[in-house]
A protein has these predicted regions:
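Short gly/ser-rich loop at a beta-strand->alpha-helix junction or flexible surface loop bordering the NTP-binding
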Residues: 1-162, 301-305, 314-326
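Surface segments flanking catalytic/ligand-binding clefts of nucleic-acid enzymes
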Residues: 115, 119, 130-326
Length: 326
């Protein structure tokens, strides 16, 4: 891959954007890490200028003729250029077991030629999530890029660097490992404080619940990892939220499996709320669901002040977006 010219007017910059790796895989705008203050912005190339030392392991070499920023350093460079809410979303994705990735037709064709029908198979590292009709989607399953412990450790190491305050503030909001954008959106609406537009509830993601004998007979599972576990302040009341995304839960088989798991958890005494995107994105419907959840938690649902309502509206504008275009 050719080097990036420093000058914004250098015609080689546009030719770089036509390179197959950029055009069909990385996409534009192309974000590059650079030193020096010249040419930070361009039509299809965005330079993230970083002068001075970088945290150890910030840059990794690849077999494609270019170096890339590590996931943690990528988040740090983003911290000073995106809202804290968007940074939280990026952290959830990198610490989670999913990715949203649009595959260009040329890349898909190359994958099909190399791997056949197995191009989206989990055995190749990333597993493509198919919709109810069996068609590929932009949602993928993959191992986490960042461990939660590494996120916290990195936040402690970067104090004083540009973007560190925003990074640390966002890292404190990550409640666990999630498996889809819907789980991220739900976790942020439930978990962020009312001063940030959320509901300020205590929650954890995908915590292990060991099934009782009766629950195992119903579900056929030894353990379950519910999407969201909500609890009241003293932990005496709990409520489970299962996010029902169309891509994962749309098929008949998935619905039957979800029903078995839900019944098994209810048999163990857990209230279970099945949350859809429609219920989450519609503020009035979300309020009704919140009333149900708070009744399970034996907590009053306090009305939001006009200021808190405005903060929730802004939060919703930040999180309900085209995730692939973020």
């Amino acid at each position: 891959m050719p080097d990036l010219p420093d000058s914004v007017d250098d015609p080689r910059r546009e030719r770089l954007c036509e390179h197959p790796l950029v055009k069909h895989f990385l996409g534009t705008p192309l974000h590059v890490l650079a030193q020096g203050g010249c040419g930070r912005k361009g039509g299809r190339i965005v330079r993230h200028v970083w002068n001075g030392g970088r945290p150890f392991g910030s840059v990794r070499q690849t077999e494609f003729g270019l170096d890339v920023a590590s996931p943690l350093f990528t988040l740090l460079t983003l911290a000073s250029s995106v809202s804290n809410e968007r940074l939280i979303m990026c952290m959830y994705e990198m610490c989670g077991t999913f990715a949203v990735c649009k595959i260009a037709p040329q890349v898909k064709l190359a994958l099909e030629q190399a791997c056949g029908s197995r191009w989206g198979d989990a055995r190749l590292g990333w597993e493509n999530v198919r919709d109810a009709s069996g068609n590929p989607t932009d949602l993928w399953k993959r191992p986490p890029l960042i461990e939660l412990s590494d996120l916290t450790e990195f936040a402690n190491k970067i104090q004083g660097l540009r973007g560190a305050k925003s990074f640390t503030r966002a890292a404190k909001c990550i409640t666990g490992i999630v498996a889809s954008p819907l789980e991220v959106q739900a976790s942020m609406l439930f978990g962020l404080s009312r001063l940030r537009g959320g509901e300020g509830l205590r929650l954890t993601n995908n915590v292990e619940i060991r099934m009782t004998r009766s629950a195992r007979l119903i579900s056929g599972l030894d353990r379950r990892y519910p999407d969201i576990l909500l609890s009241n302040k003293d932990g005496s009341r709990e409520c489970l939220v299962e996010c029902q995304g169309k891509a994962i839960h749309g098929s008949i088989e998935s619905k039957i499996s979800d029903s078995d798991r839900t019944t098994a958890l209810q048999a163990m005494g857990y209230p279970v709320v099945l949350m859809t995107y429609g219920q989450l994105v519609d503020s009035d419907a979300f309020r009704v669901v919140m009333e149900l959840i708070m009744s399970y938690l034996d907590m009053p649902l306090k009305d939001k002040t006009p200021r808190q309502q405005e903060l929730e509206r802004r939060l919703r504008e930040e999180i309900f977006i085209d995730w692939a275009g973020m």
